[in-house]
Amino acid sequence: MGKKKKRATEKVWCYYCDREFDDEKILVQHQKAKHFKCHVCHKKLSTASGMVIHVLQVHKENVTKVPNAKDGRDSTDIEIYGMQGIPPHVLTAHYGEEEDEPPAKVAKVEIPSAPLGGVVPRPYGMVYPPQQVPGAVPARPMYYPGPPMRHPAPVWQMPPPRPQQWYPQNPALSVPPAAHLGYRPQPLFPVQNMGMTPTPTSAPAIQPSPVTGVTPPGIPTSSPAMPVPQPLFPVVNNSIPSQAPPFSAPLPVGGAQQPSHADALGSADAYPPNNSIPGGTNAHSYASGPNTSGPSIGPPPVIANKAPSNQPNEVYLVWDDEAMSMEERRMSLPKYKVHDETSQMNSINAAIDRRISESRLAGRMAF
């Protein structure tokens, strides 16, 4: 714990005006002359409350503020005499010291982060406690009977399994199995006429050791047949003739016949390209020609006299009515017609006359 600093030079100062003095007696004389002096008879009093009582009893006046004081420190409720009676927070703010001391610093403990590969194995018979904080009492190691030391048996590492294919395969095409060792990945899209040599369809099987005659555990005597991945999207080009696969699969044990070249072509044609658009890629949708017989109520006519552009599925709207614009056509519709007041009054009068005649006719029929 740190010791609290003592004020080397505690100068006295006035609470009302923050003026510093060398002696408290001089401060008291200053307060009597500047802050506790009656403004009527100029009598010097000792405290602010004494000044208030004097002015009230003698001069019949009320004093609510201490004269010649700063804003916020002119209250007459606080009893000040020299340095006595000053609130603690004002003293703290004046001397620039904090009321509470900062907490003691805690020693920072750094835990070394060692990689997993660099951990040294410990003997079976002892368990070491974790690293202790400096200054704490270390715990004693604990002992327990452990299993006898044995040499670990040699473990043959298996090669990582290949990921499964998530795209469907074409059942009509015969895909030869690829060897597990010496596998060469196929491209995403089939590349033709590139002059590439085919990958060997099989690799020599692992032979047993000539000395022991035992195959190492975990490795099969013959590599399993792995399917060759097919392209993600089947691509068929009509300009390039389809070719047979550079290699063929071995005949199965059952003696099934290998599919012919015609079957392979038929199965390849079963997957048409997805970019086929009815009417061609440059097809456009054109409306019928304009109706030049006369103005008609309805949407404006559409004409397509422009040559088709490269962008597909476009509709060109052209207003070809030279006698009437789109606004005039809209104003000719009954929905947008505007009636004048004369026609409206005539229609109202006609409706009233019709009602009167109907009522008279109904009265005659009642008799």
From Swiss-Prot:
Instruction: Mark out the compositionally biased spans (Polar residues).
Output: 273-295
InterPro entries in the cross-refs: Znf_BED, Znf_C2H2_sf, Znf_C2H2_type
Q: Does the keyword Metal-binding apply?
A: yes
Q: Describe how expression is induced or repressed.
A: Not regulated by photoperiod or vernalization.
**Gene Ontology cellular component terms for the protein in this record:** nucleus
Give the protein's function. Sequence-specific DNA binding factor that recognizes the 5'-CCAAATTTTAAGTTT-3' sequence. Recruits the FRI-C complex to the FLC promoter. Required for FRI-mediated FLC activation, but has no effect on the expression of MAF1, MAF2, MAF3, MAF5, UFC and CO. Dispensable for the reactivation of FLC in early embryogenesis, but required to maintain high levels of FLC expression in later embryonic and vegetative development.
- What's the name of the protein? Protein SUPPRESSOR OF FRI 4
